[in-house]
Amino acid sequence: MSECCQHDHSHEREELPRTRHAGPVRLTFKVQGLDCAEEVSTLRRAVGPLVGGEDKLAFDVLNGRMMVLDGAANAGVEPIREAVARTGMSAVEWRPGTDGSGETERRRRLQAWFTAVSGALVLAGVAIHVWLAGSLSEAWRLFAGHGSAGMPWPELAAYALATAVGLRFVLPRAWSAAKRMQPDMHLLMTVAVFGAIGIDEWFEAATVAFLFALSLALENWSVARARRAISGLLNLAPTNARIKATDGTEREVPASEVPVGAHFIVRPGERLPLDGRVLAGASSVNQAPITGESIPVTKQPGSEVFAGTINGDGALEVESTKAAEDTTLARVIKMVEQAHAKRAPSEQWVEKFARIYTPAAIALALLIFVVPPLVFGAAWSDWFYRALVLLVIACPCALVISTPVSIVSALAAAARSGVLIKGGLFVELPARLKAIALDKTGTLSRGEPVVQRVLPLNRHTEEELLERAAALEARSTHPLARAVANAAATRGISAHSAAEVEIQQGKGVTGVFRGERFWLGSHRYLEERGQETPEVHERAEAFEREGQTVVAIGNDRHVCGLLTIADTVRPEARSAVKALRDAGIAHVVMLTGDNRTTAETIATQAGITEVKSELLPEDKVVAVGKLVERYGSVAMVGDGVNDAPAMARATLGIAMGAAGSDAAIETADIALMTDDLLKLPWLVHHSRRTLAVIRQNITFALSVKAAFVVLTFAGVATLWGAIAADVGASLLVVTNALRLLSPAWGSELSEDASVKN
């Protein structure tokens, strides 16, 4: 059988290298103060020379981690920590199992407290001003900007304290940036604050210090919010398991201590603590936390179950098949956490833009300060103030925070829906797809073919045909071989494996059974053997026109008979293909090792017009390569194991039904945890929604900056107004990014994010 044999032996071929993924990690550091892309850029410049280049570093802003990749120069832990310390941040070596979240949370709470105190002192200063002036209308003079003076000492003291408290976490970083001669937003804000103090604008200095501290607190909150969306997955699995001892007694132990092979009990309504196989009992299990399926799945003895899923109304006895740290849920969480280290193109663009934008804004501020007074004789104080406003505008807070939060939110939302995306790059790729190649068996079809007809010839019986076929296929694990074995078992036929079995790669199999040599193979193999009669040819053609796979069985004298085997198309296949086309992906191609007639029948049922059939494993790689050359951005959808070489050749590799399959999760760029083909158009729309949010945020943040540059030249903008606008922009872009976490918004398959291919 062409397809049978090709799948049986594809694992013997060497997989193509997957260069899109980050390399293995040598060292990981927990970095205090790593919150956004600007810190990433700072750390790359500081640590990159020690490890052999900036490309030897990867960053996980979500968890505040810096990774040194394999292949990096051996700099040692202490030199790296010292380099990080020179940036004003701190680093400690991190290992799996350690938890640095306590220190991070303590720092976040302390920073929030200082911010609140700074804000309270600013309000106190305003209250003192109003009280001493005796009129609320006098408060407006504070907000009028440059020109206010004559401040009484209690009010000045309140603003001075507000400034000092607001700069508590800013000054150390600003001093480090100044020493390195690499200005960052902390240095810009510090210069702006002290510049305002220099011209006796204490209210503006205090307001800028407070609002910048507020923007940093907002940044921490948004990252923590996205982090909680990921860590919430971890809480799905119970910490304890109810173990059943050999004497029948039950006791609770930590799930992390349960060995593989142990038996545990799951009562109705409880979550499963570990992956396993059902030994006794029957129940319906809600697998939505893993696969995103909304309908519970029936489980009975022999069924596979996953940690974090919810048991229905029946008790189950389960044998543990994986340790707690190796469950499907644990692997999903680990993959999602690591995914953010693989930066999306938009994240890389923002980081590069910030490197150019901030120095350019500083240069413009210097020109504004110097040129008008020198060339046109303008007042130095007025243009110095405007230069300070430009320094505030140069802070890229809203710009650098928006994209990472959007990417992390998209990763978390996808994981909740049963779609494991393994990097920011792969969040954006589905939006740009021009073509999708789908494997037939197990992807478009259920992958569980059954024997439809048994046609004996030349005086052989149906039982003899099934017995010989089962003997020849006894050692094969291919779905067609299982269909033969199931058909034989259904009729009560048991057969020992044939002797001297020889695989005819891509064609069939031969072997000796009951002292006689038999062969089994595809219609093409039958033709090559030269044993096909007109009658056999006519019948085989008729079966193939019905979309069935023909398997011939014979000996050295004649054809003993034919078996027809058919797979069934998934019920949602046609609607999924239509949804992909409606999304603008016009080229949907089916790849299969089946004969052309059978392949076209299946394709017609699925609504696919372009078919490539009778492909050997290496042919699929070539076919995908041609699609990439023709269309550019191409996804290959398969099982993640047999199709791994073809998936590696595609722009994007997507594995179907990856729940419980370690190989599929490892090899694919994106793993669909269930077999629902409708997840494909959902993925495309989700990617487009994410890109739309990122573009909206970048456009809005830059528009606010541009507007304030114009207002500054016009002499209308104030320091407090510029920083307030930046904080407001940060709040809006973060809120917009966090919309991606909304289940209601993310579930609207038909929503178009207006990002076209």
Language-model-detected regions and their locations in the chain:
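Cytosolic catalytic headpiece
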Residues: 1, 48, 247, 424-642, ...
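Conserved catalytic phosphorylation-site environment of P-type ATPases
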Residues: 186-190, 226-227, 239-240, 290, ...
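Membrane-embedded alpha-helical bundles of multi-pass transporters
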Residues: 135-151, 173-174, 179, 191-199, ...
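Flexible metal-binding regulatory segments at protein termini and peripheral loops
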Residues: 1-151, 232, 247-252, 330, ...
